[in-house]
Amino acid sequence: MTLNLLTAISPIDGRYRSKAEPLAEYFSEYALIRYRIRVEIEYFITLCELPLPQLSSFDKSLFPMLRSIYETFTVAGAQRVKDIESITNHDVKAVEYYIKEQLDAFSSAGNVPAGYFEPYKEFIHFGLTSQDINNTSVPLSIKEALEKVFYPQIEELISQLESYADEWKDVAMLAKTHGQPASPTRLGKEVMVFAYRLREQLNLLKSCRFTAKFGGATGNYNAHHVAYPEYDWREFGNRFVSEKLGLEREQYTTQISNYDHLGSIFDAIRRINTIIIDLDRDFWMYISMEYFKQKIKAGEVGSSAMPHKVNPIDFENSEGNLGISNAILQFLAAKLPVSRLQRDLTDSTVLRNIGTPLGHSVIAVQSTLKGLRKLILNSAALQRDLDNTWAVVAEAIQTILRREAYPHPYEALKALTRTNTKMTEAAIHDFIRTLDVSDKVKAELLAITPDNYTGI
C-alpha cells in the first residue's frame, strides 16, 4: 500500500498532516539525517579550524562548499543515505559514507582537483561514536522546532486570549466554584488568567537549557586523547557544541546524553498543554451554559442524526490531542534519563518519537485557536444568570457589616441565603432595610448588585 494521507497509520501524517507539516522539517527521517550531516560537517570544519596537523593544509575557502551538503540537502539525498544504510545496517555510519561520497562528487564535478579530499576524508566522524551525532542532532532539532513552530503558535494563542480579555474586560459574569454560584467576576479577567498562565509557562520553557552529549564512546574522549594527547578536548567539545550548534555540552556523561534537561523541556511543554486543556474545558462549559454561541458555516454538519447540532468540536479535538501529547511527554521525561550502565539502546527508538507529542500539541493549539475564533458572546445569557443569582452579594454585605462591627454578620447572611429558596433582589433589599446600621451604610449595601460586585 502506497503511503499517503489516506494510508498513513498516524493521524499526524494523515488526517492532520496540514496542521503538523511544519514539524517535518525537524522530526522526519529526512530531517534527522540532515541534522546528522550538519553536525558531522560542522565538526569536521572545527577540526580544520583547530587545526589538527593533518588538516592544517585544508583550504578554508571550501567551508561553504562543505556546508552546502546539508544546506541544500534533499529528500533524494536522504534516500541515498537510506540506500547506504540498507548495506551498513547502521544509520550514522551511512551518513559518514554519504558525506564521503559528496566529497568525491565535488572532485568529479571539477570543484576541486581530483583526489583533493583523500588525505582529509578519514577525519569525517573522527574519534566519535554515533551518540555524539545523535545527542547533538536531536536537541538541536527540538530547539529549532520550538523556536520556529511551537513558540510562535503559543504566542498566537496568548495574543488571541489577550485580545478577548481586553474586549470583554467589562463584561460581568457569574463565577462558579464547585459548579455552584460564587462571587461574580469579569469575563475578560477569566480569559486573562489563561493568557497569564501560558505566558508564565512559556517563559519557563524558554529558560530550559538545551544540552548535548559530545565526548566519544564512553564520554571520556578516549579516541581523541590517545591520538592527540596534547589537545584539550573538553575545551574543544565545549566550544564546538556552543559556537557551532548553539547548545551546551554536558560535562559528565556515559556514551549517551543524561537527558535530564530534555526531561525538563518535556515537562515544561506538558504544563503548557495542561493549561490549554483547562482552557478547552472551560470554554466547552461556557458554550454549554450558552454564554457563547458559535459561528455557523454553511454546509457543515454537527450530527449525523440531529440536524440542529452545533458542537464545540474544536475544543474537544484540542483536548484529545493534548491528552495524547501529555501521555507521551510524561513517558519521554521518565524513560530517557534511565539507561543501563554506560548505555543501552532503548533511548534510540524512543528519541524517534519526539515529534509525535509535539505534533499532537501543534494540532491542538490550532484547534483551540479555531474554536476561540468561532465564539459569539451571548451577553443576554450572562446577564440572565447574574439577575437570577442575587445570593452572591451576601459576601459583600457581610463584609461591610464586619467593617461596621455589626454582630454576627456572616451568620445572619448565612441564615438568609443558604436555603433552597431562590434569593431575589427584593429579598436582599428587604433584609438590608431591617439592619441596625446607618442610612449611609444601607445605601451603600443597596447599591451592590451582581453586575457591579466584580472586584478590581
Regions picked out by a protein language model, each given a short descriptive name:
Residues 2-29, 65, 71, 301-456:
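Catalytic-core signal marking the mid-to-C-terminal active-site face
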Residues 2-221, 228, 232-240, 302, ...:
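A helix-coil-helix interface module used to build multimeric assemblies
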Residues 42-47, 98, 102, 145, ...:
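Generic, well-ordered alpha-helical scaffold segments in large soluble proteins
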Residues 143-151, 155-158, 162, 192-195, ...:
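Short amphipathic alpha-helical segments with heptad-repeat character
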Residues 166-169, 210, 284, 291, ...:
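Alpha-helical coiled-coil oligomerization motifs
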Residues 201, 248-250, 254-340:
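Glycine-rich anion/phosphate-binding loop at the beta-strand->alpha-helix junction
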Residues 205-214, 283-293, 423-424:
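Short conserved catalytic/interaction loops centered on acidic-Pro-aromatic/His motifs
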Residues 231-255, 259:
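Active-site-adjacent "gating/activation" loops or surface patches in catalytic cores
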